[in-house]
A protein has these predicted regions:
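Short internal beta-strands
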Residues: 15-22, 172, 249-250, 455, ...
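Aromatic-enriched
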Residues: 31-151
């Protein structure tokens, strides 16, 4: 909102800068324009700043000694200077960056800096736009040491922190895949912290090796994207039936199949919830921002270790590659991680599937623990004894026990928080990496007199305990997500009778806040 000022969001999008030197007759003819005014022909309504950037750069650098090709490469810096004027930004940071980048080519650095200033001065001297903007820099909400971090690195750090908190070694079995590979790269740098990384021959081996590491007593993780989850599903199910702690990180990308490897979507939600054979319950957590990836990864590990279950952590390409200022955490402020280890006094009457009566969690006997030799596997087991069983009643009981264990996790996760007006006419609902866009849309609408509220889900399965109570308070609910309505359908199944509208886009791109505002405003008017 500080960027938008009093003019509002739409006004920011009414400026386009173009190099008028690029619109020569032959160029327009090649582009099949019928007139010499392509903007009018296309019906562009924004204010177009037509600036002869190429010719002005040539004139400015004619005595620089650079060849024509090198001079024209400076055009972007002229445009950047004009943008800095438009947004009332100092050129100091850009000048510093250019001097550092071209330290070995000072003549290139100085040429770029010269046209950078030319662009700024052009805007100031010609009053190139009818209005300018000011971006106010806010101080951090809390004091501390901050660094810039992206989602993949934050995920890696969250995994390391959880392993340290639990007193375990961290094992990553992975296979490179866009856009998740950077987690593997980052973790591989930290052997000194007890991290073991194995780049396996394929996705299946990556997950299967992690299941083995979980049985051996490590905090086990595998990282991938949607296509990789398809291949890992059988090994993931081995962790389900074996009731082993495993974290599966899915950095979602555009699909299906190879799809759009470098683009972002939220299309793997139902895959995370149900994309395995049999009744295969698995907790699902969705990170909401680059910095939240640390907390989400930490909590995924905590749930996996304390409840002896595989956990899916969903991020996406937008969150994974996006960056933000991150306050370095104090691990003393994070909750303890206490795996349900067997104790020596249990040895005399212990069985492999013996459970804690309160949580339904089976106890963890890592190999080498004296008196607790046992076996597990992918075949159905007899309740408690762990022997292979095909008895109908036993299978029915085991299916319900595994489901109840995951359902019980709702007692250990935060309740759903609602932001905005208590008497809102519309509740905006989102999940995962769309948090920032939806929050901005709500804030803008409230600033303009609309009564709206916002609830964003990080915990998907199980849902927070107060989910039904929250959602049933509102007459109108809109679920916005980057798929065709997967979470909306999931909510309808879990909380029947809701009046849910949907805002769905599957473009491989983040939401445009203006489009969200327009759609939500229209819903309010219906």
């Amino acid at each position: 909102r500080d960027v938008l000022g009093s003019r509002g969001l739409g006004d920011v999008y009414k400026r386009q800068i173009t190099d008028s030197d690029s619109f020569e007759a032959r160029d327009l003819e090649k582009a099949q324009f019928k007139t010499d005014n392509p903007f009018e022909e296309l019906g562009v309504k924004q204010e177009v700043l037509e600036v002869p950037i190429s010719s002005m750069c040539k004139e400015s650098l004619k005595d620089s000694g650079l060849d024509n090709k090198s001079i024209l490469r400076c055009k972007n810096m002229f445009a950047l200077g004009l943008v800095c004027w438009l947004f009332n930004r100092s050129l100091a940071a850009a000048e510093k960056m250019l001097r550092e980048k071209f330290a070995k080519k000072p003549e290139i650095a100085e040429a770029n800096i010269k046209v950078l200033n030319d662009g700024y001065n052009y805007g100031a001297n010609t009053h190139a736009s009818t209005s300018t903007y000011k971006i106010e820099s806010k101080a951090p909400k809390s004091k501390g040491l901050y660094t810039d971090i992206n989602g993949n690195k934050a995920t890696a750090y969250g995994l390391i922190a959880a392993a340290e908190k639990a007193g375990l070694g961290l094992y990553l079995g992975s296979y490179p895949i866009t856009p998740a590979t950077d987690i593997l790269h980052e973790l591989a740098k930290h052997k000194s912290l007890g991290v073991k990384t194995v780049q396996c021959e394929d996705e299946i081996a990556g997950c299967a090796s992690a299941v083995g590491a979980a049985f051996a007593g490590a905090l086990a993780v595998t990282t991938t994207s949607g296509p990789g989850v398809c291949l890992k599903s059988e090994a993931m199910n081995l962790a389900v039936i074996g009731e082993l702690p495993l974290v599966i990180v899915n950095v979602q990308r555009g699909g299906p199949s190879t799809g759009l490897p470098t683009k972002s979507e939220q299309t793997d939600l139902l895959q995370a919830l149900y994309g395995r054979n049999g009744e295969s319950p698995m907790p699902v957590i969705a990170a909401t921002s680059p910095t939240n990836c640390f907390d989400a990864a930490y909590m995924a590990c905590k749930i996996a270790l304390e409840h002896m279950t595989p956990v899916v952590l969903l991020t996406d390409a937008f969150v994974a590659n996006g960056s933000a200022a991150w306050k370095l955490p104090n691990l003393d402020e994070y909750p303890a991680i206490n795996p349900p280890y067997v104790t020596p006094d249990m040895a005399s009457n212990w069985t492999p599937y013996q459970r804690n009566p309160e949580t339904g969690v089976r106890y963890w006997a890592t190999p080498g623990t004296e008196g607790f030799m046992h076996r597990i596997g992918g075949l159905e087991k007899s309740n408690e004894t762990g022997a292979i069983s095909t008895e109908p009643e036993n299978h029915n009981k085991m299916v319900h026990l595994r489901q109840a264990k995951v359902d019980k996790i709702a007692d250990y996760i935060p309740e759903l928080e609602v932001l905005g007006d208590e008497d809102a006419d519309l509740l905006i609902v989102g999940w995962g990496g769309t948090y920032g866009h939806l929050r901005l849309a709500m804030d803008f609408m409230r600033d303009h007199g609309k009564k709206v509220a916002f609830a964003h889900f990080e915990y998907i399965n199980p849902l927070p305990k107060n989910t039904a109570d929250v959602l049933r308070k509102y007459k109108k609910i809109v679920v916005a997500e980057q798929n065709l309505g997967q979470f909306a359908g999931y909510l309808r199944m879990k909380v029947p009778g809701l009046n849910i509208s949907q805002f769905n886009q599957v473009k491989g791109q983040p939401f445009v806040t203006r489009e969200l505002i327009d759609a939500f405003t229209k819903l309010l008017e219906e």
